[in-house]
């Protein structure tokens, strides 16, 4: 079983995360940001990851530290994963009504993000849309994953939700175990 617990305790956030990569899509997420909980739940469900996340953040300031630190902690959980026999690459194209999100992932030990997301609104509930790209940068830097994404559409809720669903599907594909693979790198290490 590939299950991990990660805790982060700073002056800005207190986070406890439990992740089972080989889960069934069960989730219990409490970040204090309702829409963020919603899209993280979509990530877990569509990635078939069991995810428990308890966060106490300085939301009286804004949601930046909470979103950033969740990306850091989730990234660290995936970085802890044994890389032997994983498929390494994952991708997904997910529609949601008028919106469409494309995500491509390489779990190759090289963090890099190329994101094409332009918000039409500043907020979805109490979630700042400017933090979408920052979440993925925080995740990528800590998971050491190369991540490309592109989102089109009009409805901000649909765009961001489609993106997190595509993220879950692509991560599920990339983390899937294939015993034939060994270390999927000509270098012999990831």
UniProtKB/Swiss-Prot annotation:
GO BP field: L-histidine biosynthetic process
Top-level enzyme category: lyase
Protein name: Imidazoleglycerol-phosphate dehydratase
Coiled coil: none
Homology family: Belongs to the imidazoleglycerol-phosphate dehydratase family.
EC code: 4.2.1.19
Amino-acid biosynthesis as UniProt keyword: yes
SUPFAM superfamilies assigned: Ribosomal protein S5 domain 2-like
Substrates-to-products reaction catalysed: D-erythro-1-(imidazol-4-yl)glycerol 3-phosphate = 3-(imidazol-4-yl)-2-oxopropyl phosphate + H2O
Record NCBIfam families: PRK00951.2-1, PRK00951.2-3, PRK00951.2-4
Organism: Methanococcus maripaludis (strain C5 / ATCC BAA-1333)
Pathway(s) the chain acts in: Amino-acid biosynthesis; L-histidine biosynthesis; L-histidine from 5-phospho-alpha-D-ribose 1-diphosphate: step 6/9
InterPro entries: IGPD_sf, ImidazoleglycerolP_deHydtase, ImidazoleglycerP_deHydtase_CS, Ribosomal_Su5_D2-typ_SF
Gene Ontology MF term list: imidazoleglycerol-phosphate dehydratase activity
Subcellular location: Cytoplasm
GO cellular component, as recorded: cytoplasm
Record key words, sorted: Amino-acid biosynthesis, Cytoplasm, Histidine biosynthesis, Lyase
GN (gene name): hisB
């Amino acid at each position: 079983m590939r299950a991990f617990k990660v805790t982060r305790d700073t002056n800005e956030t207190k986070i406890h995360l439990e992740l089972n990569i080989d889960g069934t899509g069960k989730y219990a997420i409490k970040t204090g940001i309702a829409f963020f909980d919603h899209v993280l739940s979509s990530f877990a469900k569509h990635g078939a990851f069991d995810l428990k996340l308890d966060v106490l953040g300085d939301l009286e300031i804004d949601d930046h530290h909470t979103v950033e630190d969740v990306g850091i902690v989730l990234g660290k959980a995936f970085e802890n994963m044994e890389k032997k026999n994983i498929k390494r690459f994952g991708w997904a194209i997910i529609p949601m009504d008028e919106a469409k999100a494309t995500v491509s992932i390489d779990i190759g030990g090289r963090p890099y993000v190329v994101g094409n997301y332009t918000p039409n609104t500043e907020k979805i509930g109490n979630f700042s849309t400017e933090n979408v790209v920052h979440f993925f940068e925080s995740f990528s830097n800590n998971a050491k994953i190369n991540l490309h994404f592109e989102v089109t559409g009009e409805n901000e809720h649909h765009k961001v939700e489609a993106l997190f669903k595509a993220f879950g599907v692509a991560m599920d594909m990339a983390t899937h175990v294939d015993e034939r693979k060994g270390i999927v790198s000509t270098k012999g290490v990831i």
